[in-house]
C-alpha cells in the first residue's frame, strides 16, 4: 500500500505541479478573453436566473430532462461537498493560507470554462428511447472525429466512473465518517453503511428522485452553513483583516507569515489551491456538464450562464467562509486536519454543538455530492455499456461508499486527485477544439437568437446556414 501511495503521489506531483496547473488556468484565461469576460458581463443575469429559479416552481424531472434550477442544484450538489470543508482545510495545511487566493483565481477563470462546458453539453446532448443524456463524452466524440474521438470519449467515461463513482465517493464517505467519529464517537464503518443504504435508495429512483433530492437539500444546507459560518466570523471580526493578510501575503511571500522556502511554498500554495479548488468547484473537470445537459432551456447559453453561478456559490461564498472560520478562530496550528479543522473553529464559539453542527453539515454536503456524482457516473456507464450495466454500477458505488469510510484519508484523497486530473485532460482538449462553437453560440445568444423551441416536450432542430455552427437540439444515437 505504501508503494501505491508513493507512485500515486509522484504522478499527482507531475500533474498538479506542472501540467494541470497551467492547463486549467490557461484554458480559463483563454475563454475569459475569447468570451470577453463572460463571467463578469453575464453575472447579473446568472444571479437572476439562479435565484429566480428557487422561487419559481419548475418542471418536474423526467426522462426528457430537468428544470434549469434542478440541473444547477444537481451540479451544485456535486460541487458543494467535502471540498468546501475537508478540502479547504487540507489546502490550508498543505499550501498555507495563500492556497485560498489561488482557489479564487482558478475559480474566477473557471467560471468562463464551466460556461463553455455547460453550453457544449446542451448542444451535443442526445436523445435515445425517450431519455436525454449529455456530458463531455458526447462533445469529446464530436470534437475529434473518427476513432480518436471515440477513444478519448471512452477514456473520459472510464476516468469519470472511477473518479466520481468510486474514489470520489470514497472521499465523501470518509469525511462523513471522520466528522461523526469526532462529534459522536461513532465507528466510521457504521456511518458508511448507513450512508450507503440511504444513497442506494436514491439511486434506484433514477433522475427524477435525484433531482427531487438535490433541489430540496442544496438550498437549505447551503443557507444553514453560510449563516453558521457568518456567526463565527462575526464573533471574531477583529481577526478578519489579518486573515485576508495571510491569504494575500501567503500567495506570493509565504515567508512573511512564517512559511518555508519561497519558491517551494508558493508552488505548493498554487498546487493545492488549484487542485483543491478543482475538487471543490469542478470547473474544467467535466463533471457538472452531465447535469447541465438535462436542463430544459431555449438556448444552450442560458444554462451556461446558470452554470457559472455554481462555481461562484461553491468557491467565493462557501469555501471562502470555511477558510475565514479556520483563520479567524486561530485553529490553524492546532494539529487538526481534514474536516476536524473547521469543526475546531466552530467549537471555539459554539462548544460541542459546533462540532455536531459541522458533522451534520458534512453529512448533507457529502451525501448530496454522492448523489450527484453517482448520476454523473451513471451517465457514462450508459454511454459505454447502455442501461443494462446501471444496476451493477449502483451496487459497486454502494460498496465503495462503505469501503471509503474505513480507509486512510491521505490515500483516498491522492487517488481522487489522480483520477480528477485524468478527467481534466480530454475534457479541456475538447473545449479548446470546440471553442469556436462556444463563441458563436454566445454571439447568437446575445443577439437574441432562439435556436431551440420545445414541441410536445421534444426539442426540435431549428437552424439556418448562417448559424449552422450553433444549431442546437437533441441528436439521436445514429447521428
Locate predicted features.
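Transmembrane helix-loop junctions in multi-pass membrane proteins
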Residues: 3-4, 34-39, 83-88, 164-176, ...
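Membrane-interface loop-to-helix entry segments
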Residues: 23-30, 34-47, 156, 173-180, ...
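Flexible loop linkers connecting adjacent transmembrane helices
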Residues: 37-66, 90-100, 112-147, 332-349, ...
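Selective recognition of specific alpha-helical transmembrane segments in multi-pass small-molecule
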Residues: 109-117, 193-207, 218-238, 271, ...
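Extracellular/periplasmic helix-exit of transmembrane alpha-helices
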Residues: 115-123, 129, 230-246, 254-261, ...
Amino acid at each position: 500500500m505504501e508503494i501505491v501511495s508513493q507512485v500515486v503521489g509522484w504522478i499527482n506531483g507531475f500533474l498538479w505541479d506542472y501540467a494541470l496547473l497551467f492547463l486549467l488556468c490557461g484554458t480559463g484565461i483563454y475563454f475569459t478573453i475569447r468570451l470577453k469576460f463572460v463571467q463578469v458581463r453575464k453575472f447579473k443575469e446568472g444571479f437572476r436566473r439562479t435565484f429566480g429559479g428557487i422561487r419559481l416552481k419548475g418542471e418536474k424531472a423526467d426522462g426528457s430532462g430537468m428544470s434549469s434550477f434542478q440541473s444547477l442544484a444537481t451540479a451544485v450538489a456535486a460541487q458543494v461537498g467535502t471540498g468546501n470543508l475537508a478540502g479547504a482545510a487540507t489546502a490550508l495545511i498543505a499550501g498555507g493560507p495563500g492556497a485560498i487566493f489561488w482557489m479564487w483565481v482558478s475559480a474566477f477563470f473557471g467560471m468562463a470554462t464551466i460556461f463553455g462546458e455547460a453550453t457544449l453539453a446542451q448542444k451535443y446532448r442526445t436523445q435515445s428511447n425517450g431519455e436525454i443524456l449529455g456530458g463531455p463524452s458526447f462533445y469529446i466524440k464530436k470534437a475529434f472525429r473518427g476513432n480518436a474521438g471515440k477513444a478519448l470519449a471512452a477514456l473520459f467515461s472510464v476516468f469519470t466512473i472511477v473518479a466520481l463513482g468510486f474514489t470520489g465517493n470514497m472521499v465523501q464517505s470518509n469525511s462523513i465518517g471522520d466528522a461523526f467519529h469526532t462529534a459522536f464517537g461513532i465507528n466510521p464503518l457504521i456511518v458508511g453503511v448507513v450512508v450507503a443504504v440511504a444513497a442506494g435508495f436514491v439511486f434506484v429512483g433514477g433522475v427524477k428522485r435525484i433531482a427531487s433530492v438535490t433541489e430540496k437539500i442544496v438550498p437549505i444546507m447551503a443557507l444553514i452553513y453560510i449563516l453558521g459560518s457568518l456567526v463565527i466570523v462575526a464573533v471574531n471580526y477583529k481577526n478578519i483583516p489579518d486573515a485576508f493578510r495571510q491569504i494575500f501575503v501567503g500567495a506570493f511571500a509565504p515567508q512573511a507569515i512564517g512559511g518555508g522556502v519561497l519558491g517551494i511554498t508558493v508552488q505548493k500554495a498554487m498546487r493545492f489551491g488549484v487542485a483543491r479548488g478543482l475538487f471543490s468547484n469542478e470547473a474544467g473537470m467535466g463533471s457538472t456538464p452531465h447535469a447541465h445537459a438535462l436542463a430544459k432551456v431555449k438556448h444552450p447559453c442560458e444554462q451556461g450562464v446558470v452554470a457559472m453561478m455554481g462555481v461562484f456559490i461553491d468557491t467565493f461564498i462557501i469555501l471562502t467562509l470555511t477558510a475565514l472560520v479556520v483563520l479567524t478562530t486561530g485553529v490553524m496550528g492546532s494539529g487538526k486536519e481534514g474536516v476536524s479543522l473547521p469543526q475546531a473553529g466552530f467549537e471555539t464559539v459554539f462548544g460541542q454543538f459546533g462540532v455536531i453542527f459541522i458533522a451534520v453539515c458534512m453529512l448533507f454536503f457529502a451525501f448530496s455530492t454522492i448523489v450527484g456524482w453517482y448520476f454523473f457516473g451513471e451517465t457514462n456507464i450508459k454511454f459505454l455499456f447502455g442501461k443494462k450495466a446501471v444496476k451493477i454500477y449502483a451496487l459497486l458505488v454502494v460498496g465503495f461508499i462503505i469501503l471509503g469510510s474505513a480507509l486512510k484519508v491521505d490515500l483516498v484523497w491522492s487517488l481522487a486527485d489522480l483520477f480528477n486530473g485524468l478527467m481534466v485532460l480530454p475534457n479541456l482538449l475538447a473545449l479548446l477544439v470546440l471553442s469556436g462553437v462556444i463563441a458563436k453560440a454566445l454571439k447568437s445568444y446575445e443577439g437574441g437568437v432562439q435556436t431551440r423551441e420545445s414541441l410536445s416536450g421534444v426539442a426540435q432542430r431549428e437552424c439556418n446556414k448562417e448559424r449552422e455552427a450553433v444549431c442546437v437540439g437533441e441528436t439521436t444515437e445514429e447521428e
